[in-house]
Amino acid sequence: MTIIRTLFVYYSFLFILVLCSSKDTEVNNGEKVNIVAFGEGRCSDTSFWMKWHWLPMWRMLGSTGRINFEYHPYGIKTTCVDSDSGDDVVCECHHGARECLLNQLQACVIEALPNFEEYMEVVTCIQGKQNISMAAEACFNEPSKLERAKMMSCADSRHGRKLFSDHENFVAQMAPEMDWAPWILINGKRYKEAEEDLWQFLCDRFIDPRPIHCPKKIIY
């Protein structure tokens, strides 16, 4: 009886230890990781992150089915208000009017292709372009669900401005303290490390069991 009691205490201790360890390291045991990112169309930091962290991460880990992602083209020092007449929206952006148009174009694409798997390549292509004409020429050439003329018309319309302004609601709900772009939330919490090495950070901290696509655990 003493041996049974001793074994029970021992295995109970191991069970509690595993639970505490799992909580402390924030490992996501088989569940999906939810990532929400906010950025600005002509922000160099956003552009670098999307090109060198966001897109490569998705190409490596998207097939695992473990990542949920959403992007909102709305950053800091950005405001959208109803016009005096009340029939339009007036927006001002951190990097000027051209950025607003790029953000609006991205918002139009996200409306047309609501699934992240569909819109991410196009939104990344638009990101950082000098203007929407250059973005349209570079990003709407291949046969797709998107018509260049329709997207351009949307971007510079009341509807496009309204779509863009709607993304402000997500800032208010999920990132009211946002003071930097890109602003990246993982499972509802902001991690600056996700800006510096998204792929490595996700693999080291959030995805378990670790997919074969992940690099060796060396940092986090």
Curated annotation (Swiss-Prot):
InterPro entries: Interferon-induced_GILT. Keywords: Glycoprotein, Secreted, Signal. GO terms for molecular function: oxidoreductase activity; oxidoreductase activity, acting on a sulfur group of donors, disulfide as acceptor. Belongs to the GILT family. This is GILT-like protein CBG03282. It comes from Caenorhabditis briggsae. GO terms for cellular component: extracellular region. It is found in: Secreted. Residues 1-22 form the signal peptide. The keyword Transport does not apply. Glycans are attached at residue 131. Pfam families: GILT.
